[in-house]
Each structure stands twice: as C-alpha cells, then as structure tokens.
Amino acid sequence: MFLGIDCGTQGTKVLVLDTESGTVLGEGSASHSLISDHNGRREQDVGQWLNALQQATRDALAQSGVSGQQILGIGVSGQQHGLVLLDAQGEVLRPAKLWCDTESAPENQRLLDYLGGAQGSLQRLGLVIAPGYTVSKLLWTKEQYPQLFERIDKVLLPHDYLNYWLTGRCCTEFGDASGTGYFNVRTREWDLPLLAHIDPSGRLGKALPQLVQAHEAVGVLHPEIARLLDLNPAALVSSGGGDNMMGAIGTGNIQPGLITMSLGSSGTVYAYADEARVSEHESVATFCSSSGGWLPLICTMNLTNATTAIRELFALDIAGFNQTVAEAPIGAEGVLILPFLNGERVPALPDATGSIVGLDSTNLTQANLSRAVVEGTTFGLRYGLDLLRDSGIKSEKIRLIGGGSKSAVWRQIVADIMNTPVICTDHAEAAALGAAIQAAWCWSHADGKAEGLQQLCERCVSLDQNSETHPVVHNVAAYQQVYQRYQAQLRKF
C-alpha cells in the first residue's frame, strides 16, 4: 500500500493505492487559501499545507479501511516554482511565493536581460525563465527583505519542503528543479554562477537541496511524523516531484507518443521525451521528467480560475455552468474572452489583462459569456499545443486530467479545438496517483526488486472509456475560424 500526496494551489489531495491490484482504495482532501494583492502577489502560509496534509491523510486512510501501518511508501507532488525559505533552525521565514505570483516580474526581466534575453537563457539553461519561476523570487526577496534574506539557510520548492517535514532531509529531484530557473536541464546541474549573480556571498548556493535521481528515496518517515500521521515508521518517502511531472506518471505518460493536458487552476500540456530536445519556441519549457527523461511543457496561467470567476459571477454551480455553456453555439455568437486575469505565460503576455471582445445588444447573455470563457481558456492551450507540435511532439490522442476534464461539454470543446480525440484517466487527480506510483517504484528499488515504472503504470493507470470524445468535423472547421479571431486579438497586445 502506498500514499500519494498532491499539494496544489487550491488544496491537498491524498490517496491510498494498492499497487498489486492497481486500485485506489481511498481518497481525502483539504483546502488552502491564497494571500493575494492587486500587485500580482500570490502567496500561501505553508502551515496550511501541513494541516491539509494531515486532514487529507486521515480521511484517505479512513475511507480505504487500510491501517497506516500497512503503508510502505509515500510520494509527494507539489505545485511547481514556489519558494519556501527556511532559517538555520528549519523555521519558515515567510509565506511561500507561488507559481502564479507575478510580483517579481520586473526582477525576472532584469535576470533575463543579464542572461542575454530569451536566446541567452535557452543557450545557458535550456529554457527561458518566466515570471513565476523561482529565480526571480530570490532576487525579489533580497531587495524587499534584506534582513530576512541574510537568515536564509535552505531554499526549497513546495514538494521539497513537504519531504523535509516528513523526513528531516533536504533534497530535490531533477523534474521539479527544472522549474527554478537556476537549473541546467541539459546537464541536470544547478547554475551556481547565476545564483552568485543574485548574491555574491554564496549563501544561495549553500542553501540548495541535494539533487537525487527520480528512483531514489529521500528517506524514512521521521518518527515524530509517523506517530502524528499514524503511519508505518519504516515507510519510505520517494523523491517526489512537481505536479506536472507526477501528473505525467499518473497518466502513464512516461514514454514518447502521449500528450497529457491538464485543465486545472493553470492549464498545462506536456509529453515525455528521451532527450533534452530544447525547442526554439521560448514558451516551451523543456523540463526534466520525474521518471528519468524530459518533459517538454507549456503552461497557461489562466484556466479554471477564469471559468470559476464567470461561474461565480452568475452564481451557478458546476452542473448549472456546464448546462449554460452547452446552450450557446460554437463561437458564442461572436463573444470572445481573452481570460488573462493573472497576466499570461502562453502566449507570453505577462502584463496583459483580461478582455471581452465582440459584445453587442443581441449576444450579451450568460450562455455566451460562459461558453466564451471556456473557449478562450482552451484557445490558450491550443496555442501551446501548436508550439509543442511544431517542436516535433506527436500524439494521436490526448489524455485529459484536472477538474475541467470532468465536464463532458468541455471535453468536446477540447477535442474540436485541438482536432484530436481526448480521453480521461479514471482518476482525474493524476498528480496524487503519479506520486503513489513513483513511491512504489522507489520502494521497489530500495527493496531490491526494481520493478519497472512502466509495469506499475500499466497496472495502476486506467482510462475511462466512457469519457472518450472525438472531434466533430464541422465543429473543427467552425472553431478554426474562431481561433483565427483569437490569434488576431493576440497581435494587438
């Protein structure tokens, strides 16, 4: 039995996985809240993560009927790019700045200029640093909180911090490290000179966690944490990884030929690669995977956050919102929403704001606005998918995950806009499932069995055949015209 933990933006999810049968026996969840400001600040109190982890673990075990003493391993998935700073006593210095935080966008631009622009960043790191990456948060912290900066002893990502809390050991793996902006994805090494540019004292380089291989365990549970969670004190904690890397494992996307698309708070599209094929498109991030390879990826900053904003504006529940979307025709009678509520990464418009185009006295309806926001967010994913395809990524089918994938009308919109069949996994929360599968993989290595990750995925990742959705020919043609309008609007920014 293995635990998979996913610490996301909106909450923490935990599941209990029986890897012998490939069955999820129980699930639990608990929510987080955001610290937000109009200047782009998006932070969280990491204490919420710990409280949510404890609650969700208790609930998952209770639902499963499994004793915590039967748990052999634990895997942690975490939201990427977040910055958790600890002092020499292991205390958190300030709230964690998150992936969706754009307060440090000016610092990111200064660092990008130092690297020689997009091409210089690609050449040096294998990707282009973007607002939201960890590196600019460090420069921001130094300039905004200089006294606090001098107390930094450990620089961690969200999943690193949870692994540290669970085991007492500071380390990270290549996948999540890829999203820091101070890691070379080709050589899989920290870029220490870049950190020395931010702070010549060398403090930051000394504060970095040790790098470990994806199949390596971090260690066993700390005895105090094992008692707190009522878990087997000999349970191994795996290397873990970022939520996208764990989502790849949780959808079986660990070899070339598959594309995973996540309809979550952010939107992501990614595929596995055997080598670091750095794209010429600066919006494509060639991250490392948490399964031993690489994970070319695009990320949009606005997805269910935008659809939720419209849904709540109209006081609709999810079922009512989906019905309202279905009532409007393709193209929402000319209404087009560019849903850039948090700026945007793909397309690269960090300073953009949202807009509604094409409104008149005849098409201003709940149905049109509801459909337009779903279409607008999906067009952003199409923009990114085109970049991946242009970089040589191919797939005959898309595996959909995330909250939005539960909507039948949204699945049809995705299939039509992408002109590709889509199918959901049985477990939409693929990151938690991937974390549990990776935990089993790490445990098998430590136990001397070395069961292959492919075998585990084949046994534990199942597809929901009832969700399979194919593009409709006349819908594809209609959406191509609407997408061209979307592209024309982008050129005005």
State each model region's role:
Residues 3-5, 112-125, 133, 139-171, ...:
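Active-site core segments that coordinate phosphate-bearing ligands/cofactors
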